[in-house]
A protein has these predicted regions:
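Alpha-helix N-cap/helix-start motif
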Residues: 4, 60, 84, 145-146
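Cysteine-nucleophile active-site neighborhood
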Residues: 53-120, 134
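Active-site phosphate/pyrophosphate- and oxyanion-stabilizing loops and adjacent acidic/basic residues
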Residues: 9-13, 89, 140
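Short glycine-/acidic-enriched loop or helix-start segments at secondary-structure transitions
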Residues: 36, 59-61, 92-94, 147, ...
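Pocket-forming structural segment of enzyme catalytic cores
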Residues: 97-177
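N-terminal beta1-alpha1 cap of cysteine-dependent amidohydrolase-like domains
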Residues: 1-79
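A structural signal for short, well-ordered beta-strand segments and their strand-loop junctions
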Residues: 26, 82-84, 175
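Short alpha-helical
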Residues: 2, 6, 89, 159-160
Length: 177
């Protein structure tokens, strides 16, 4: 143990802060060769959290296509998805939206002055959150086309889409960049 936690370990620790009464399975759709065997019964899950990555969706590698395919399957069978950063980009792409390299710069460490819009102020994702806030972030890409029926929740000068809610198949997807 070198003392550095993976993104997955940090997410688990954060969730366990609120409750340890959860059964959490971890998969990597890019490298798990039997991904659908490992999670045969996606229907049993109450939710899914899809975290960050340094990949770019438009690179269109086999590893990225595997993730998009797996997300499509999750959207058919998992009711609640929290899509964080890369997870948002995969969820949007799987649902017919589009992600491209950002044209207004990048977030390198902190995303500044995220503004929650009127729809976001009503959404549980931002319950009790200040209307303008900063948050840790590393991203070079942005959602440029929203999936059908999406509700934009927040934006900043770098990314128009910082918070998003949409439904795809069975899933209610809450996404944050």
């Amino acid at each position: 143990d070198n003392g550095i936690k993976t993104h997955t370990e940090s997410l688990k620790e954060s969730i366990n802060y609120f409750t340890n009464n959860l059964e959490i399975d971890t998969v990597n759709p890019s490298s798990d060769s039997n991904i659908f065997e490992k999670v045969k019964d996606l229907d049993k899950y109450d939710g899914l959290i899809w975290g960050g990555s340094s990949l770019n969706i438009y690179s269109d590698t086999i590893e990225i296509r595997k993730q998009i395919d797996f997300m499509r399957e999750c959207q058919k069978r998992v009711k609640n998805i929290l899509a964080i950063c890369w997870g948002l980009q995969v969820a949007v792409t799987a649902a017919g939206g589009e992600v491209k390299q950002g044209t207004n710069g990048a977030h390198r460490g902190i995303a500044h002055e995220i503004i929650i819009n009127s729809e976001g102020l009503k959404h549980l994702l931002y319950k009790d959150k200040k209307q303008i806030f900063n948050t840790p972030a590393f991203n070079y890409d942005e959602v440029v086309t929203l999936p059908a029926g999406s509700t934009l929740l927040s934006s900043n000068k770098v990314n128009k889409v910082m918070g998003l809610n949409f439904k795809s198949e069975l899933s209610d997807i809450w996404g944050i960049q």
